[in-house]
């Protein structure tokens, strides 16, 4: 992608795209691998530092290309070791990236959009509306910046980042091409060499793009479910009105079967006090997912101002988990991490910007959606 300087940002190019770039400037394709290693393995953003690239080629690259990561506005470290970066992208909006360390892994939670158009009622990101899609360079740039912050080399065994989850701000499947490109760089040995089993894309349920996903990439899939029936999910996750549960689960099953192997869907379920945490909800969930190879990740709600929701008691959380476990499911309850720096699940809002502002583009998207719904309603009568 060409930046405001008129140069091509090499940070977001996949290996084939990098090879095409070197073709276009009359250079050998093997240079693509050299430059990708400098960028992603060693965190280099200055062509002058690429010691195995000749001076003439370095000067040529300086004239037509650049390596421009997004700008780090702030970095916060939680008492539990969780880190959160606020990052400003080219549109002027801010997004957030979170690193969660555990004993056996380091997981980076990456954003795909500034804001989100899906307006899930319990998610603070949705409250700020949709601002912009991130470029491939801005998506993979979050991985680049995190590695740079840790001073680690991705190719080493003791790498800081072992897993990446597309679970930050935004709906990844509504920024399809850029997210796919970034995930390819994550998994490329010339990029970050992360196993496909350790890269997870989370979706609220954009069915046409789930159906398209297997044609382009092989990664783990997570579904933001949050309700065991259509009536409740319509309220919590409004996209369910367009793609109800039966259609959505069929699409997820289709993705897993297309790729083959022992695929398991990760089901994410945010527990909201007295809303979706009752025994009858657990019973409905057991019935809904009975034939779906899945593991269930329960997420106790992380409060934010004016949400209108509360976190269930620990007893209610344990009861819900036990009911699902007795129903035959592999169930874990996510430990809240980074809530003291507003980095917990559902708390990402790009706080440097005015969180109440909705861009003209977002308003137009919502109006178009409303117009389509009115037309559909009129056609059905």
Curated annotation (Swiss-Prot):
Q: What else is known?
A: Reaction proceeds by a ping-pong mechanism involving intermediate methylation of a conserved cysteine residue.
Keyword terms of this UniProt record: 4Fe-4S, Cytoplasm, Disulfide bond, Iron, Iron-sulfur, Metal-binding, Methyltransferase, rRNA processing, S-adenosyl-L-methionine, Transferase, tRNA processing
Per the UniProt record, the source organism is Pseudomonas putida (strain GB-1)
Task: Name the PROSITE patterns on file.
Answer: RADICAL_SAM
Biological process GO terms, please?
rRNA base methylation; tRNA methylation
Active site residues according to the UniProt entry: 96, 345
The EC designation for this entry is 2.1.1.192
Q: Which residues does the UniProt record annotate as the domain Radical SAM core?
A: 102-342
User: What is the protein name for this chain?
Assistant: Dual-specificity RNA methyltransferase RlmN
UniProt similarity note:
Belongs to the radical SAM superfamily. RlmN family.
The note on cofactor binding and number reads:
Binds 1 [4Fe-4S] cluster. The cluster is coordinated with 3 cysteines and an exchangeable S-adenosyl-L-methionine.
Cofactor field: [4Fe-4S] cluster
Q: Which residues bind [4Fe-4S] cluster?
A: 116, 120, 123
Q: What does this protein do?
A: Specifically methylates position 2 of adenine 2503 in 23S rRNA and position 2 of adenine 37 in tRNAs. m2A2503 modification seems to play a crucial role in the proofreading step occurring at the peptidyl transferase center and thus would serve to optimize ribosomal fidelity.
A family per Pfam? RlmN_N
**Its GO CC terms?**
cytoplasm
Give start-end ranges for the coiled-coil region(s): none
Q: Which chain regions cross the lipid bilayer?
A: none
Task: Kindly list the places in or outside the cell where this protein is found, as annotated in its UniProt entry.
Answer: Cytoplasm
Q: Where is the signal peptide?
A: none
Write down the chemical reaction(s) this protein catalyses: adenosine(2503) in 23S rRNA + 2 reduced [2Fe-2S]-[ferredoxin] + 2 S-adenosyl-L-methionine = 2-methyladenosine(2503) in 23S rRNA + 5'-deoxyadenosine + L-methionine + 2 oxidized [2Fe-2S]-[ferredoxin] + S-adenosyl-L-homocysteine; adenosine(37) in tRNA + 2 reduced [2Fe-2S]-[ferredoxin] + 2 S-adenosyl-L-methionine = 2-methyladenosine(37) in tRNA + 5'-deoxyadenosine + L-methionine + 2 oxidized [2Fe-2S]-[ferredoxin] + S-adenosyl-L-homocysteine
Disulfide bridge positions per record: 109-345
InterPro entries reported in the protein's UniProt record? Aldolase_TIM (IPR013785), Methyltransferase_A (IPR040072), RlmN_N (IPR048641), RNA_MTrfase_RlmN (IPR027492), rRNA_lsu_MTrfase_RlmN/Cfr (IPR004383), rSAM (IPR007197)
Q: Which residues bind S-adenosyl-L-methionine?
A: 170-171, 202, 224-226, 302
GO molecular-function terms, A-Z: 4 iron, 4 sulfur cluster binding; metal ion binding; rRNA (adenine(2503)-C2-)-methyltransferase activity; rRNA binding; tRNA (adenine(37)-C2)-methyltransferase activity; tRNA binding
Entry annotated with the keyword Ion transport: no
